[in-house]
Amino acid sequence: MSGRDKGGKGLGKGGAKRHRKVLRDNIQGITKPAIRRLARRGGVKRISGLIYEETRGVLKIFLENVIRDAVTYTEHARRKTVTAMDVVYALKRQGRTLYGFGG
């Protein structure tokens, strides 16, 4: 560990708080053309207008589940940074094995 213990790495020592943009309604960032491109990749020819909101809802739930599991792995390892392997293991736990990111 090069002489440092696991506890403090210079984080959380106070100081000026940075202004962070409040994140709300980010799911609208998944645009209609982006959803259309994903559908095209899946072989879809025509898309109903009601699909876009439904797709955003399903994607939001899926990502919440994956991120929750990935953060659980991170916290168990006592880290503050979510790694690619945390996400790979979270996906594997849900039965969606992902290749190409190590492990």
UniProtKB/Swiss-Prot annotation:
Its main location: nucleus. It comes from the Eukaryota. SUPFAM superfamilies: Histone-fold. The modification N-acetylserine is found at residue 2. This is Histone H4 variant TH091. The modification N6-acetyllysine is found at residues 6, 9, 13, 17, 21. SMART domains: H4. The nucleosome is a histone octamer containing two molecules each of H2A, H2B, H3 and H4 assembled in one H3-H4 heterotetramer and two H2A-H2B heterodimers. The octamer wraps approximately 147 bp of DNA. It is found in: Nucleus; Chromosome. Disulfide bonds: none annotated.
